[in-house]
Every structure is written in C-alpha cells, then in structure tokens.
C-alpha cells in the first residue's frame, strides 16, 4: 500500500512538472495581439499603436519574421518599444538583433523606444546603446 501511494505521488509530481515545462516552452514562443480602444478628445481620428515590451532578447522566427508579420497585420500608426527588449547581460549579437528589429519596424511605422531596467543596467557597460537605437530609426524617449 505504501509503495502504491509513493508511486501516485511521483506520478503526480512528474505530470505537474511536465505541464509547467510545456506551458513555459510554448508560452514563450506564442505571439498574441490584444486590442484596446481608448477615447481621447482632440485626437482628430483613430490611431493604431503597437506596444512591445519585455522581449528580453527573445526572437520569434528567423530575424523576428513572425513578430514583424504580426505587427504588419495590425497596420500601426506608431510602434512603442517599452523597455526590456534585451537582457541586462546581452552580448553584442543580442544588441545587433534589436537594432535589426528596430530597422524593420521603422519600415512599418515610426518607432519610439523607452529603455527599461535591463537596458539601463546594460548601458553601464555599453553607453552607446541609445545612440545605436536612434541610428537604427527609433525616437528615444528617455
């Protein structure tokens, strides 16, 4: 009886661990778009904004092709990158990937970049990040 209880506990723990692992694995690869309507006086008409944040260097397809396609589908008037696009421990390759993403997004709509805590920590070792972001086509909001 004791052995059967032990086997049930091990099986339950294994199922829970596997479920959590799969949720994290597939959740990190999924792109979703949420729509919100906000009414602002004196705006002069509807404006579509895409807000991206907390990618932490994650890539969605080769050169972010899936992410870029999803953003193009939204036909935005502006794109806001709201921090933590890279990790605090990013290497030059991660930064170049971010800059390529900004260049591609800039072809779709104006891009606005606000650094998050990870960018701010990264800039303690590479102070040129915001200059590079601006040169890639984003307006830096700091």
Model-derived features with residue positions:
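Core catalytic region of metal-dependent phosphoesterases/phosphodiesterases
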Residues: 63-142
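N-terminal membrane-anchoring alpha-helices
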Residues: 1-43
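A generic structural signal for ordered alpha-helices
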Residues: 12-16, 49, 111
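N-terminal start-of-chain detector that recognizes signal peptides
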Residues: 8-11, 20-24, 51-53, 84-85, ...
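N-terminal signal-anchor transmembrane helix
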Residues: 26-76, 91, 127, 138
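Short amphipathic alpha-helical segments, especially helix-boundary/capping motifs
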Residues: 10-12, 42-44, 75-78, 105
């Amino acid at each position: 009886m004791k052995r059967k209880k032990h086997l049930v506990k091990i099986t339950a723990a294994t199922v829970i661990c596997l479920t959590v692992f799969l949720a994290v694995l597939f959740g990190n690869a999924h792109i979703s778009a949420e729509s919100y309507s906000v009414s602002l006086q004196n705006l002069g008409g509807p404006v579509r904004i895409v807000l991206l944040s907390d990618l932490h260097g994650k890539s969605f397809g080769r050169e972010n092709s899936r992410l870029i396609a999803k953003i193009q589908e939204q036909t935005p008037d502006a794109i806001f990158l709201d921090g933590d696009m890279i990790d605090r421990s990013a290497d030059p390759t991660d930064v170049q990937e971010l800059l390529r993403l900004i260049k591609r997004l800039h072809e779709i709509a104006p891009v606005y970049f606000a650094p998050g805590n990870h960018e701010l920590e990264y800039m303690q070792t590479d102070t040129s990040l915001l200059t590079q972001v601006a040169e890639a086509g984003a307006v830096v909001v700091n």
